[in-house]
Amino acid sequence: KLDHGEYVSLGKVESLLKTCPIIDSICVYGDPSKAYVISLVVPDRNKLTELAEKLDLGTLTFEDQCRHRIITAEVLKEMTSYAKKVKLEKFEIPGAVTLCSELWTPESGLVTAAFKLKRKPIQEYYQKELKAMYGLK
């Protein structure tokens, strides 16, 4: 539930956005005191490199591509237009994204053996990034 009382089904948003070509894995997070959701995305390596090349940033490493603000902004733009295409409500569309260069594997403890998200461990692992997306320190 967001601060204006809208209930967001994180699983629904994730399953629809996971079909966006640039997304390999996604975890959507909603702070009940905020008006929008945010997202952590493990991008598809090839698609991100293609995007970086279009932006003349193809020489960057994958890790640097994931951290580059222009690339991140472009991914968010792609996600937003895709979200509208799959008919997500305005409040279900992530208002910010952090690109994660590390794959989420059962060994990392961030997903189960069946590759289902483990929300708590993901939120703890990316605590700093989640706060930054909401503009908190």
What is each PLM-predicted segment?
Residues F62-R69, Y126-K137:
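Acidic/polar alpha-helix N-cap and adjacent early helical turns
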Residues K1-F91, L103-E107:
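AMP-binding/adenylate-forming catalytic core of the ANL superfamily
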Residues L110-V111:
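Short, conserved non-catalytic motifs in the polymerase core
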